[in-house]
A protein has these predicted regions:
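Conserved beta-strand positions in the central sheet of alpha/beta enzyme cores
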Residues: 22-24, 114-115, 134, 233
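Conserved, well-ordered alpha-helix/loop/beta-strand core segments that scaffold catalytic motifs
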Residues: 220, 227-230
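Alpha-helix-loop-beta-strand connector modules within alpha/beta enzyme cores
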Residues: 49, 53, 247-259
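Internal, glycine-rich beta/alpha segment that forms the wall or movable "lid"
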Residues: 2-112, 121-122
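Outer-membrane beta-barrel pore domains
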Residues: 207-211, 230-237
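An alpha-helical appendage that flanks or caps ligand/catalytic pockets
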Residues: 37, 43-83, 123-223
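Active-site beta-loop-alpha junctions enriched in small/polar residues
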Residues: 26-30, 98-100, 118, 136-142, ...
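Active-site-adjacent beta->alpha loops and helix N-cap segments on the catalytic face
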Residues: 118-128, 241-244
Length: 259
């Protein structure tokens, strides 16, 4: 999809619904899929390409004059966006921040660098980072911890086929975050805490989960906020009601931070 097509879609959504959207810009991390498309671009170069791609989108949406851009991967000449998008609807940009190349791309674009976090007590402080920072997690929380774990086990049972697929994906991905999570899963094998990688190990999702009581999960979320993370991308919940439980967690975390 050409950057102009993306910009046109964003502009159309803005005019139709008067709502701001966020764009999650992905460089691609599964080498076999890229090779099937005859895309042999190295990991860091893919982020350089992503910067060019996103820069054209940003310039089209932010400006009222024609856009000309000469890059290594993309070239446009006097390309105009009609109608222009209102300034208050300019999309936020999210970029993977798990690798140095991703962090550099986020900084170049003024984007939020999103990562897959370590357990809260091990997460490095990022408050001094140049870019805004966020994390992707799943949350299963209830008033009673045993209830939360019962739901977690029902939602993510052991899946041998999924485990084999996960192992294959480890061999074909050059994504820094995939390697980091896989290493942490191996190191924590046989243990069970609030930070839970079982869904990731069974190829059901690509992020860690926080499981436990409202108070316990909120304590972990509060620690991530104290580290400097301000954006939280949640794994897709199975039902609307699950969002109500998650909202209680964030309300509790905010209360902890104001004490």
């Amino acid at each position: 999809m050409h950057p102009y097509t993306v910009a046109k879609m964003v502009s159309s959504l803005g005019h139709l619904y008067r709502r701001r959207v966020y764009l999650n810009m992905v460089a691609g991390g599964f080498k076999n899929d890229l090779a099937a498309l005859n895309d042999l671009t190295p990991h860091d170069k893919r982020y350089a390409r992503l910067v060019e791609y996103t820069t054209i989108i940003q310039q089209l949406l932010k400006g009222t004059s024609p856009v000309s851009y000469q890059g290594e991967f993309y070239v446009v000449d006097k390309l105009r966006m009609i109608p222009p998008l209102s300034a208050d609807l300019i999309p936020g940009i999210l970029v993977s921040g798990s690798s140095p190349a991703g962090l550099m791309a986020a900084a170049a674009l003024g984007a939020t660098a999103v990562k897959y976090p370590q357990p809260a007590e091990c997460e490095p402080d990022c408050q001094s980072d140049a870019n805004e920072s966020g994390i992707r997690i799943g949350i299963i929380a209830r008033e009673n911890e045993d209830d939360a774990w019962r739901i977690a086990d029902l939602r993510f049972p052991e899946d041998r086929k999924g485990q084999l697929t996960h192992q294959l994906a480890m061999k074909t991905s050059d994504s820094a975050w995939h390697k980091q999570l896989s290493r942490m899963a191996s190191e924590s094998e046989g243990t069970r805490g609030t930070y839970w990688l079982w869904p990731f190990e069974n190829y059901k999702t690509f992020c860690p989960y926080l499981v436990g009581s409202y108070q316990r999960v909120a304590s972990e979320v509060a620690k991530y906020i104290e580290c400097g993370h301000r954006t939280f991308i949640l794994d897709i919940p199975p039902a609307k009601e699950e969002l109500e439980h998650i909202n209680l967690v964030f309300s509790c975390a905010r209360q902890m931070l104001t004490k």
